[in-house]
Amino acid sequence: MLGLAVTRLRITQIRSSVGEKQNKRGSLRSLRLRHVGDTVDCDDTPQVRGYISACSHLVRVEEIH
């Protein structure tokens, strides 16, 4: 894997999870997001993309290099 650039994602929670279904709240928890304004950097993997798609209306996603 030397020389391969791994795409990273910066994920920011922009809306509260209050009133959301349990699976969407669980996706935020799996992404290590607890409060509005929290930001995490993650590798771009299918698992992370699945979490993002489950709660896409609650988060903002940026690609970083």
From Swiss-Prot:
Keywords for this entry? Ribonucleoprotein, Ribosomal protein
Cite the InterPro entries for this sequence: Ribo_uL30_ferredoxin-like_sf, Ribosomal_uL30_bac-type, Ribosomal_uL30_ferredoxin-like
Output the Gene Ontology cellular-component terms: large ribosomal subunit
The biological process GO terms on file are: translation
Which molecular-function annotations from GO does this UniProt entry contain?
structural constituent of ribosome
Q: Which CDD domains does the record associate with it? A: Ribosomal_L30
How does it associate, per the subunit comment? Part of the 50S ribosomal subunit.
Q: Which family does it belong to?
A: Belongs to the universal ribosomal protein uL30 family.
Q: What is this protein called?
A: Large ribosomal subunit protein uL30
Q: Which organism is it from?
A: Tropheryma whipplei (strain Twist)
